[in-house]
Amino acid sequence: MVRSGSFSVDSSATHQRTPSRTVTLGHIQPQAPTYRTVYCNDRESNQPVRFKGNSISTTKYNVFTFLPKGLFEQFRRIANIYFLGISCLSMTPISPVSPITNVAPLSMVLLVSLIKEAFEDWKRFQNDMSINNSTVEILQDQQWVSIPWRKLQVGDIVKIKKDGFFPADILFMSSTNSDGICYVETANLDGETNLKIRKALERTWDYLVPEKAYEFKGEIQCEQPNNSLYTFTGNLVVQKQTLPLSPDQLLLRGCSLRNTEYIVGAVVFTGHETKVMMNAMNAPSKRSTLEKKLDKLIITIFCVLVTMCLIGAIGCSIVTDREDKYLGLHNSDWEYRNGLMIGFFTFFTLVTLFSSIIPISLYVSIEMIKFIQSTQFINRDLNMYHAETNTPASARTSNLNEELGQVEYIFSDKTGTLTRNLMEFFKCSIGGVSYGCGVTEIEKGIAQRHGLKVQEEQRSTGAIREKGFNFDDPRLMRGAWRNEPNPDLCKELFRCLAICHTVLPEGDESPEKIVYQAASPDEAALVTAAKNFGFFFYRRTPTMVYVRESHVEKMGKIQDVAYEILNVLEFNSTRKRQSVVCRFPDGRLVLYCKGADNVIFERLANGMDDVRKVTREHLEHFGSSGLRTLCLAYKDLNPETYDSWNEKFIQAKSALRDREKKLDEVAELIEKDLILIGSTAIEDKLQEGVPTCIETLSRAGIKIWVLTGDKMETAINIAYACNLINNEMKQFVISSETDAIREAEERGDQVEIARVIKEEVKRELKKSLEEAQHSLHTVAGPKLSLVIDGKCLMYALDPSLRVMLLSLSLNCTSVVCCRVSPLQKAQVTSLVRKGAQKITLSIGDGANDVSMIQAAHVGIGISGMEGMQAVMASDFAIAQFRFLTDLLLVHGRWSYLRICKVVMYFFYKNLTFTLTQFWFTFRTGFSGQRFYDDWFQSLFNVVFTALPVIVLGLFEKDVSASLSKRYPELYREGIRNSFFKWRVVAVWATSAVYQSLVCYLFVTTSSFGAVNSSGKVFGLWDVSTMVFTCLVIAVNVRILLMSNSITRWHYITVGGSILAWLVFAFVYCGIMTPHDRNENVYFVIYVLMSTFYFYFTLLLVPIVSLLGDFIFQGVERWFFPYDYQIVQEIHRHESDASKADQLEVENELTPQEARSYAISQLPRELSKHTGFAFDSPGYESFFASQLGIYAPQKAWDVARRASMRSRPKVPKK
C-alpha cells in the first residue's frame, strides 16, 4: 500500500490491499518513503500482496549460470580478454604457432579461477541450506508448530526462545518478562556485545500464550523495506486504535534473544527484505595505486607489441617486394603485389607470435603472493598480537598489501584509537564551582614539556576508585555535598546522571555487584559516578527508572525513588544532546538534558550569563587537561505546557514520513530556557605506545591528521601528549570562538552568522596560507600545524575555499580537526585523496569512523570498545594504534618492495623471451616463422620461470624488521614510489634488450657452420633449443642477483626450474609424433648434449648476459645507492642470527600469551553464535575463515553472518 502524501495513517485505509513494492538485494531504490500494510496472523489477507518468502540465497551462481556468469567474471579483466583474442587468432591460418601455445595457459588460468569460484559458491550454498532449514515456532490453530525458516511468511506470529536467533524482522509483541521488555544481543549486526533493551507496546503485552495470541488481528502500517538498521517507522492498528512504532519494537534478523525465557512477535520483513539483507551490499571496491600503475605498464607493453608488429609488417612488405623473384611469389595464386595486404596479414601473424610479451601468469602470481603475505605474515605477526584481548592483526583483504608501503597521510580518530576508550569520571563543575583534585596524564605531559617535575598524587582518605570512576574530592563524597554553596544543583546533577541515559543494569541490585551495559563507555562512567555520589541507579523498566538516593532528605538517610520516564529525546550526531522528561513521585515534571557545551549554552534561559561564563572557563581548563566534557541542564515543566507539547510529540512519533526530522523539531520546542547545572569531565588515557608510534611514523615522512568530535582544547592537548604537536611548531588555529562570530551569534540572525563565519574562515585561511608559504621559503623554518574546528571546517570545505584549505593543510606536518561530524571526516579524507593525489589511510574504532575508513585508500579498523563496525568496514584490523608501526614500516614496505620487484621481473623475462623471437624475424624476412617450439613457448611462463618469482615475492627483504623500524626514513622510498618509476622500467627494459641480444646473437652466430657429433650442421630447432636453454638459466639466475635476502627456497626453486626444463626436454624430445617429422624437434636435446659446444655455450652465454646487470648493480650501489643499501652497508658486518626469522618476535610473548595466540590461530568450525572475532571469550568471527584471510565485505558474507543460529546444547525432546 503506497501513500506518499500523508504522514498519519487513516484506519479506514487499512483494508485496502495493493502489492507492496520490494527492493532487491544490494540495490536500494531511490524512492520517496512509502509504507506497507501487514495483516498479523492472517495469511489469506497477505496473500494477494505476494510478500517475499523467508528463504535466502547468497550464492553467485546456479547450475545453469555458473559457466556463462563465471566466464563473464573472468573476462572482466582486460588481460584475459587480450589472451582470448590471441587464442582466437592462433586458430586462424595466419598464426605461425599452434593454438595450444596460447589456449593451454589461458585455459589453465581460467580453470583454476573457476574451480576457486565453484568451491566458494558451494560453501555458500551449503550454508544457505543450513540456515533455510533451521526451525522456528509459529502459531497455527492455537498452538505452536515448528517449521523451517524458509516457510515463514509475513504476518506470521512467532515464538523465539532464549538464546534463539530471530529468523526475520519481527514486531515485538510480548515477553515473559513482566514489564514487556526483552534483551537483545546485536553482535551479528554491529559487533557490540553489550545487550540492548527492546520494549513491547503495553497494548500487546497480553498476547503471550497461544490462545491469546490467536485472537490478535492487528494491522501493521510501516515503512517499506530499507537498509537502515537503526530506524523504523510505522503504526500498529489494533481495534481502530493507532499506536506508533519505533526501533524499540523491532527485532532484527540475525540478532539473538538473551536473558528472556521467550518472546512473541509478528513477522514484518522476510528473507531478502530484512534490514540485514538489505545491508548486504558490497563494500567499496578498492584497487591499490600500484595495481592501477600496472595497468598503465600493460598498456605500454601492448604499445611495444604493436610497434614490433608494425616493424615486422613493414619489413615483410619491403622484403617481399625486393625478393619476390627469388621466392617465386609472382607465380603464386596469392596477390603478393599488394603491399598493404601483406603488411595487414603479417601484422596479425606477428601479434600471435609475440603475444607472450604480456605475461598471462602475472595476475595469478601476484594474487597468490598477496594471499600468502596476508595469511602467513600479517595475520601471524606476533608483534601485532594483543595478548590482553587475545586479538591478532588480520588482513581482511589481500588487495592492498603494497598500498600499506606508500601511505603519506594518516587520518585518525581520537577516542578509542589514540586513547584507550576506558572512560573515568575525573572532574566536574556544579553551579560555577569546580570539583576534582586529580592530575591527568596530559597535565603531567605538559609539565614535563616545561621542565617541571610532577609529584605522585596523594589521594584523600576514603577516595573511591573503581572502573569508570577516578574522582577525588571529599567535598562531594558521602553526603558532604549538602554543605556546598549549591546543594540543590549538586542534587540535580547527580539525578541527571542517574536518570538521563539509556544504560541497562545487570546482576544483583547492589552497588558492589551490579554491572552497567552501556552504549558507550562515557555513559557507563557517568552512571557509575552517580552511584558513587550516592544516587544508585539499580533497575529499569520501559517506563520507570529506580534510583537509591542517599543523604537527600537528611544525612545518612537512604531511600528508593521511582522516576516515571515520560519521554526520551534521543541523542544523534545532529542534535548532540539527549533529554528525558520524567515525573517525580510527588508529581513534579522535570526535563533533564545533557550534551555538548555549545549546544547546551545556546538553549539556556536568560540571566545565566555569570554561571555560563565561569562554567565555560572550567570547560576550557578541563579541555586543556585532555578531558572529555559534557554540560548538564534541567528545566521544571508545568503540566499544561507539558501536555500541549506531548501531543505534538506523539504526532511526530506517529508520522510515517520524516519522523526523525519532526521529532527534532518538536524537541526544539521544549529544550529551551534551560537552567545550567554544570559540567562533567571524563579522562580517556592514551593507548600504550602512541607517542612513540606517531614520532616514528613522522620520521617516516607520514603526515598524521586527527579528526575528533572533542572540543578544541581537549584535541590540542591530546595532540601534544602524543607528539603530534610540539612547542617548536608554528600553529595555525582557525576557530569559531572569535569575538566577531560570538557577536553575530548573540544577534541570532542565522544568515548573518553564516556570512560572518565564512568571511572569518576565508580571512584566516588566506592569512595562514601566506604565513605558511613564507615559512617554507625560510631557511630552517619551523614545522607547521593546523587546528580547525567543525563549524569553521564546514565553511572551509565549501568549493570556493576548498583549494585554499587543501594548500594550507598540505604545507602542515600535523592537522587537528575538532568538533567534526562523521560526514566531515569522510569529506576531509576525500579532499586529500582526490585533491592532492596522495595515498591516504584512515584508522578508527567506531561506527562514526566507517565513512572515513571507506573514503581512504586503506582503511584500518581498531577492534576496541565501540563494537566492530569499523573493523567490518576496514581493509585491515589491528587491536592497538601502535601496531601501525609494524603494519606500515615492516609489512607495508616489504609488500611494496616485493610486488614492485615481481612486476618488474615479469616484465623483464617476458620482454627478453619475446625479443629473441623478434630478432629472429629479421633473419626470416619478417615471414612470421616461429623460433621456438609451441610447447617451449607455452610452458616458459607457467612452469620454467613460475616458482622463483613467487619465492621472490614472499621472502624478499632489503633489511630486517627491526632495522625497518630503527630507520623509519626508509619508508620514504615507498612514498616517492622509488621502485616503480618509469626510470626503473627503462632500466629493466634495457637489461631485457641486452640479454636477448646476447643470447640470440651469440648462439646464432657461433653455431653458423658448426656441426654436431654426426657431422651435420645445426638446424633451426637445434639453435632455438640452445637459445631457450640459455634463456631459462639466465632469467632464473637473475632472481638471485636481484634478491637482497636469499633463502634455501630461492636455490630450490631456481635449481628446480632449470632442472624441470631439462627433464621436460629429455622427455619431450624423446617422443616421436607425426608432427615431429616435419618440425624436427625429435632428439634435438640428445644431439646437443653430445657436443662440447653445448656445455661451453651454457656456461658462457648466461654469464655474459648477466654481466651487464652485475656491473650496473655495482655502480648503482656505490655511486647512486638507495637508502636501504646504505643501511645494509652500515650493518653489513653484524650477526645474521636474527635474519633466520621472518619477523624477530620469537621471544616477545610469555608462554601463556604464546598459548593464547596459538589457540586464536587454530582452524575451527565457524561459530553460529555470534559475529566477530575475539569480542568475548568463546566467541569467534564469521569473517574469520579457516585460513585467516578476510575478503572484502560481500553480500553473502553479511547474510551468512547475520543469519546464523546457535547449535542446541542438548537434543530436543
UniProtKB/Swiss-Prot annotation:
Signal peptide per UniProt: none
Purpose: Involved in transport of phospholipids. Contributes to transmembrane flipping of lipids. Required for secretory processes during plant development. Requires an interaction with an ALIS protein for activity. Has activity with phosphatidylserine, phosphatidylcholine and phosphatidylethanolamine, but not with lysolipid. Modifies endomembranes in multiple cell types, enabling structural changes, or signaling functions that are critical for normal development and adaptation to varied growth environments.
Keyword Membrane included in the entry's annotation: yes
Annotated spans, Disordered: 1-23
Subcellular compartments: Golgi apparatus membrane; Endoplasmic reticulum membrane
Family: Belongs to the cation transport ATPase (P-type) (TC 3.A.3) family. Type IV subfamily.
Transmembrane intervals: 68-89, 94-116, 298-319, 347-364, 901-920, 935-954, 985-1006, 1014-1036, 1043-1063, 1077-1087
Organism domain of life: Eukaryota
Subunit and interaction comment: Associates with ALIS1 to form a stable and active complex. Interacts with ALIS3 and ALIS5 in a heterologous system.
Molecular-function annotations in GO: aminophospholipid flippase activity; ATP binding; ATP hydrolysis activity; magnesium ion binding
Phenotypic effect of disruption: Impaired growth of roots and shoots. Roots devoided of the characteristic trans-Golgi proliferation of slime vesicles containing polysaccharides and enzymes for secretion. Aberrant trichome expansion, reduced primary root growth and longer root hairs. Impaired pollen growth. Impaired ovule development. Reduced adaptability to temperature stresses.
Tissue specificity comment: Expressed in petals and sepals, but not in reproductive tissues. In siliques, detected in the upper part of the seed pod and in the area between the seed pod and the stem, but not in developing seeds. Strong expression in vascular shoot tissues and in stomatal guard cells of young rosettes leaves. In roots, expressed in cells surrounding the xylem and in central and peripheral columella cells. Detected in developing and mature trichomes, roots, pollen and growing pollen tubes.
Extracellular membrane side: 90-93, 320-346, 921-934, 1007-1013, 1064-1076
Higher taxonomy: Eukaryota, Viridiplantae, Streptophyta, Embryophyta, Tracheophyta
UniProt keyword Metal-binding present: yes
Catalytic reactions on record: ATP + H2O + phospholipidSide 1 = ADP + phosphate + phospholipidSide 2
CDD domains: P-type_ATPase_APLT_Dnf-like
Major subcellular site: Golgi
Annotated positions binding Mg(2+): 845, 849
Keyword vocabulary terms for this entry: ATP-binding, Endoplasmic reticulum, Golgi apparatus, Magnesium, Membrane, Metal-binding, Nucleotide-binding, Plant defense, Protein transport, Translocase, Transmembrane, Transmembrane helix, Transport
InterPro entries: ATPase_P-typ_cyto_dom_N, ATPase_P-typ_P_site, ATPase_P-typ_TM_dom_sf, ATPase_P-typ_transduc_dom_A_sf, HAD-like_sf, HAD_sf, P-type_ATPase_IV, P-type_ATPase_N
Protein name: Phospholipid-transporting ATPase 3
Membrane topology: Multi-pass membrane protein
Residue runs in coiled coils: none
Active site: 413
EC code(s) of this entry: 7.6.2.1
Species in which this protein is naturally found: Arabidopsis thaliana (Mouse-ear cress)
